[in-house]
Amino acid sequence: MLIGNKSLKYIMFIWLALIWIVSSVPASTLPKLDNFNLDTLAHLTVYLILGLLLFANHRRGLFNRYSRQQLLMAAVILAALDEAHQVFIPNRQVSVIDLAANIGGLALAYFISRWVQRRHDRNQ
């Protein structure tokens, strides 16, 4: 185990806080990603990492009272809230495309975690 359970939990919550902080910053102070594909890829990657951290913590017992599907739905709700709160931030707007990329990253993390779990179960 490269990272201890406690450390992984803190990394996940710090990552979530960083997502929320960056999305709370007015757009005029952030670097501009003019390329649509680059912005979409950034959203997908950020939420892929969050999902991988979430499901790794689940595998290690942090959220074991919830199913992986329940955690995915909670993360999707958080992504939607994160996108929705940007309506209150100067020069920011809600983007359905950004939300779709966020959900895509979470879904990809979900399927990766299922694949890893199945591989692990077969090898035991």
Provide a role label for each language-model segment:
Residues 72, 76, 102-107:
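Hydrophobic alpha-helical segments of small multi-pass membrane proteins
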Residues 1-57, 71:
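"…centered on the first transmembrane helix and the immediately adjacent amphipathic helix/loop
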Residues 64-80:
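Membrane-embedded alpha-helical segments that form the functional core of polytopic membrane enzymes
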Residues 68, 92-93, 110:
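Transmembrane helix-loop-helix hairpins at the membrane interface
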Residues 1-6, 59-66, 122:
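Membrane-interface helix-boundary motifs at transmembrane edges
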Residues 33-38, 79-103:
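Interfacial helix-loop-helix junctions of multi-pass membrane proteins
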Residues 45-61, 104-120:
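Membrane-interfacial alpha-helical segments at the cytosolic side of multi-pass membrane proteins
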